[in-house]
């Protein structure tokens, strides 16, 4: 007798074959039968019209803190994900040196926009070594499977302390100490190692991430910790010095290849198109294809959708944040800020101003992409387009929708009318 039969579902089996209708029988937690099932079962579920798929494996997540208090890995569990890989982009919470917890929180808050207050409340930091961190997670119940990578930034901070935050070059002794900690973590069960080299990644305090300028000697020295082990993967996120000089692309990519060679393991790297990057993604693809042809196991991580951020007056980012007229009231409680922004004189002033170039903590950065915004916070709905003009960031009032129509109708017409793709824009 089977434990469970799911009847008449549309099955996507993960092989690349076309979807098909079938029954699926489960016994002892594993698929036992597939097809038209007449075997008796303790439970039968009619599922016509439902899709039945293998569980998804999400290889790029940042549950490093949440995993220590949330057994569900929400929201991934709600989207069919059954395995997650954490510790990406070189940020995480282990190894940890007591007294430096706030620095790790500021790092994750700044890079991944995870609220620092939630991390400070939820992450207990009842570990020091990476092995102890894994033991803490392993002792908790979890609804889905997970694996963890050793992030470069905490590793560097554990060995170099304040020198890591100052981005000092690692000495041979520093590299040897980091390599030992990494090797110990891999032998304890860590899935891999990650590093981040993006100019857009900053801590919540506006600092560059500790390992973003790590030398070739440091990167290859750490990668060599994988030698002789039967498992492991390296993960790299890099913008290849996009905001500095196009001539830096190849030297930066050379570092990625050097890490793969030194490790003898597979290397997975983020593959994104960034504005103002032109067609950098094609250059990345060409270098990867050449490396693979030469025998290096490089793999690309491609996002299945456009990546944006949450914007709002009570969020980390919103289009008003750089305008002097807003910054005067930025520290007021939300209700008082909203009231101040309803003042016609302040509204007119903000719309006439140009924004400073800012990041989350107020440091100058280059604005990445134009975006459109829909607001219901003033006297009726208003749509805006934010864009660069002459190297500066402008916030333009471009349309007041017909209030007799649903806002998404007039907003969509607005975007189409100015030649912007509706689905490619983050909308608030």
State where each predicted segment sits.
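Histidine-rich, glycine-flanked metal-binding segment
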Residues: 2-55
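Divalent metal-coordination and catalytic microenvironments
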Residues: 9, 29, 49, 60, ...
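Short, ordered loop/turn segments at secondary-structure junctions
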Residues: 36, 89-91, 198, 239
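Di-metal (Zn2+ and/or Mg2+/Mn2+) metal-binding site signature of metallo-dependent hydrolases
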Residues: 52-75
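Active-site neighborhood of phospho(di)ester-bond hydrolases with catalytic His/Asp-centered motifs
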Residues: 53-60, 86-88, 237, 270
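Divalent-metal coordination cores built from histidine and acidic residues
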Residues: 69-192, 229
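Active-site neighborhoods of metal-dependent hydrolases
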Residues: 133-137, 143, 149-159, 166-172, ...
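Targeting-peptide/extracellular-domain and disordered-appendage signature
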Residues: 391-428
């Amino acid at each position: 007798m089977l434990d469970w039969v799911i009847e008449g579902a549309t099955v996507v089996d993960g092989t690349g074959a076309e979807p098909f209708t079938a029954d699926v029988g489960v016994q002892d937690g594993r698929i036992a039968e597939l097809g038209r099932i007449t075997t008796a079962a303790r439970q039968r579920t009619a599922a016509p019209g439902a899709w039945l798929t293998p569980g998804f494996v999400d290889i790029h997540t940042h549950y490093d803190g949440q995993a220590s208090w949330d057994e569900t890995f929400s929201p991934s569990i709600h989207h069919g994900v059954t395995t997650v890989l954490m510790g990406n982009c070189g940020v995480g919470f282990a190894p940890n040196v007591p007294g430096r917890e706030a620095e790790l929180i500021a790092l994750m808050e700044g890079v991944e926009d995870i609220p620092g207050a939630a991390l400070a409340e939820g992450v207990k930091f009842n570990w020091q070594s990476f092995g102890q961190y894994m033991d803490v997670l392993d002792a908790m119940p979890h609804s889905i499977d997970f694996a963890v990578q050793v992030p470069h930034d905490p590793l560097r901070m554990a060995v170099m302390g304040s020198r890591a935050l100052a981005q000092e070059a690692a000495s041979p002794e520093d590299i040897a100490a980091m390599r030992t900690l990494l090797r110990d973590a891999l032998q304890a069960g860590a899935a891999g190692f990650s590093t981040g080299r993006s100019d857009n990644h900053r801590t919540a305090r506006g600092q560059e991430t500790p390992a973003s300028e790590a030398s070739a000697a440091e990167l290859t020295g750490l990668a060599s910790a994988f030698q002789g082990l039967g498992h492991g993967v390296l993960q790299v996120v890099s913008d290849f010095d996009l905001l500095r000089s196009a001539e830096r692309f190849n030297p930066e990519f050379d570092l990625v290849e050097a890490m793969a060679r030194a490790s003898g393991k597979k290397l997975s790297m983020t593959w994104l198109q960034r504005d103002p990057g032109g067609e950098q993604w094609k250059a990345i693809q060409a270098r990867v294809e050449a490396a693979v042809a030469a025998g290096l196991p490089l793999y690309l991580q491609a996002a299945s959708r456009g990546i944006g951020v949450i914007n709002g007056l009570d969020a980390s980012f919103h289009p008003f944040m750089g305008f002097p007229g807003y910054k005067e009231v930025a520290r007021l409680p939300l209700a008082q800020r909203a009231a101040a922004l309803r003042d016609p004189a302040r509204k007119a002033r903000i719309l006439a101003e140009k924004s400073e170039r800012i990041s989350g903590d107020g440091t100058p950065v280059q604005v990445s992409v134009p975006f459109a915004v829909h607001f219901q916070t003033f006297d009726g709905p208003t749509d805006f387009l934010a864009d660069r003009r002459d190297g500066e960031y402008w916030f333009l009032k471009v349309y007041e929708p017909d209030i007799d129509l649903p806002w998404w109708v007039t907003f969509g017409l607005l975007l189409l009318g100015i030649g912007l793709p509706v689905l490619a824009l983050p909308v608030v």
